[in-house]
């Protein structure tokens, strides 16, 4: 069996918030993270030196619960934030303000660190015009307030294209907003879905399709798509025995460096062949969905390929001709692909699926961080696996069999405090050793910690 993964504390993000922190969102391209705090602020930290760069204030009247960076932005960063005050804020900031290289957004240029706290006037220019311009360009601009929810906003998520923003709330609703991208920060409400029977805890967009997943206090996961200009539910997954706290998607094949599951005692060429076959089979279903719950489990879900649902005499599977009108309607069948090894004694609040390594991280109320790895099950291992309590295999029928193995655990990662969120981020401190990625955990005591992984 492959060596276990050691989780090592690299640094805290300093200074921490003095109140509970809920979530830390890594920037998609820059070495930055945005941390949501109960003190009504969003704190932007550098992953280069682990220090505070900006404190975004003044937009929300209650705790900031969630945040997400808009993808595919050039020269400007856009951050969506959701608050217990029932509103969603959109913030903008130029990535560079007259500096070259990676000095923008507070990144160091040589040994010089550029101050970026919006509460401090940065007027270091030689003239008044220059100072005013730099101060204006440095600051986060509160672009627009999206108002529609009746209660606390729990999660926000941008679609892969960056044109759609999904928000969900304690009011049991999911809203989808379209960024009109007209230069005036205008957003249009395109859908309001209210099928959930309880507080909607999380929303997460498919990595390439306009398909939205949501998890709720009603113990279900629901999938949503647009059909003929109307958004509607296409699947309802009833597998968890408690509140679904968080969702994350598996990465696309083009993302990161992950080739697929690993295998023990197999040559590189044999492993490559297995991975190629596995990717070919997986392409029929698309990326899988990861969930965690109050029932203390972490689960993986797989969409049943449309071909297997379309078995009628005129289906594309029998005629070879793609059908524009789907004979089975818009409904999708999602099935449980795996239940990961039980690693938590209390509710699991967050999961994160690495797009670079394929590792899964989970955390929650027990203050523990757990790591899981997916591995191929060889013929020689199948008999042994039946009695292996540390591994749980997928139920994927005719496809290559895999198992998820618990490979790393960090107990008491934030002392006695509950951990609310965990995320993968690209390592940026440029120090040798360790993996290319770090884990970022966010806890009740206001601390945010960065962890490295070694085998």
Swiss-Prot record:
SMART domains: WD40
Upper classification of the organism: Eukaryota, Fungi, Dikarya, Ascomycota, Pezizomycotina
Annotated stretches, region: Disordered: 103-136, 302-326
Repeat in keyword set: yes
Chain intervals with Polar residues compositional bias: 116-125, 307-321
Protein name (database record): Probable cytosolic iron-sulfur protein assembly protein 1
Family under the similarity heading: Belongs to the WD repeat CIA1 family.
Start and stop residues of the WD repeats: 8-55, 59-101, 148-187, 195-234, 266-311, 343-382, 413-455
Entry keyword set: Repeat, WD repeat
Biological role: Essential component of the cytosolic iron-sulfur (Fe/S) protein assembly machinery. Required for the maturation of extramitochondrial Fe/S proteins.
GO cellular component: cytosolic [4Fe-4S] assembly targeting complex
Gene this protein is translated from: cia1
A UniProt-annotated Pfam family: WD40
Biological processes annotated in GO: iron-sulfur cluster assembly
């Amino acid at each position: 069996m492959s060596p276990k993964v050691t989780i090592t504390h690299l640094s805290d993000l300093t200074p921490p918030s003095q109140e509970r922190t809920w979530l830390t969102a890594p920037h998609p391209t820059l070495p930055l993270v945005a941390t949501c705090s109960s003190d009504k602020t969003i704190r932007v930290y550098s992953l280069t030196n682990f220090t505070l760069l900006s404190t975004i204030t003044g937009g929300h009247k209650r705790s900031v619960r969630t945040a997400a960076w808009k993808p595919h932005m050039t020269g400007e960063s856009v951050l969506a934030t959701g608050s217990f005050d029932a509103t969603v804020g959109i913030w903008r900031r130029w990535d560079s303000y007259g500096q070259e290289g990676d000095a923008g957004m507070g990144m160091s240029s040589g040994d010089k660190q550029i101050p970026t706290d919006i509460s401090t006037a940065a007027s270091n220019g030689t003239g008044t015009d220059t100072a005013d311009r730099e101060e204006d360009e440095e600051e986060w601009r509160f672009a627009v307030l999206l108002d529609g929810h009746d209660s606390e906003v729990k999660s926000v998520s941008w679609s892969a294209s960056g044109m759609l923003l999904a928000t969900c709330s304690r009011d049991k609703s999911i809203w989808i907003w379209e960024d009109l991208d007209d230069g005036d920060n205008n957003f249009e409400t395109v859908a309001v879905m209210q099928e959930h029977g309880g507080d909607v805890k999380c929303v997460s967009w498919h990595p390439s399709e306009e398909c939205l997943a949501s998890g709720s206090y009603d113990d279900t996961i629901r999938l949503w798509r647009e059909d003929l200009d109307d958004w509607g539910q296409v699947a309802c997954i009833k597998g968890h025995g408690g509140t679904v706290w968080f969702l994350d998607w598996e990465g696309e094949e083009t993302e990161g460096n992950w080739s697929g599951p690993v295998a023990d005692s197999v040559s590189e060429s044999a492993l490559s062949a297995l991975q190629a076959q596995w990717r070919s089979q997986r392409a029929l279903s698309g990326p899988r969905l990861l969930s965690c719950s109050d029932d203390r489990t972490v689960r993986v879900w797989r969409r049943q390929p449309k071909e297997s649902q379309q078995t009628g005499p005129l289906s594309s599977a029998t005629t070879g001709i793609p059908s524009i009108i789907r004979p089975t309607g818009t409904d999708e069948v999602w099935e449980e692909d795996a239940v990961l090894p039980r690693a938590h004694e209390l509710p699991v609040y967050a999961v994160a699926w690495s797009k670079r390594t394929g590792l899964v991280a989970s955390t929650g109320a027990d203050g523990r961080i757990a790591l899981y790895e997916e591995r191929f099950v060889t013929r020689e291992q199948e008999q042994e696996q039946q009695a292996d309590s540390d591994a749980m295999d997928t139920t994927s029928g005719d496809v290559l069999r895999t198992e998820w193995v618990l490979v790393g655990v960090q107990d008491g990662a934030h002392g006695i405090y509950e951990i609310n969120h965990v995320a993968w981020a690209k390592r940026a401190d440029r120090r040798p050793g360790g993996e290319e990625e770090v884990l970022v955990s966010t806890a009740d005591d206001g601390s945010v910690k960065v962890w490295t992984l070694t085998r």
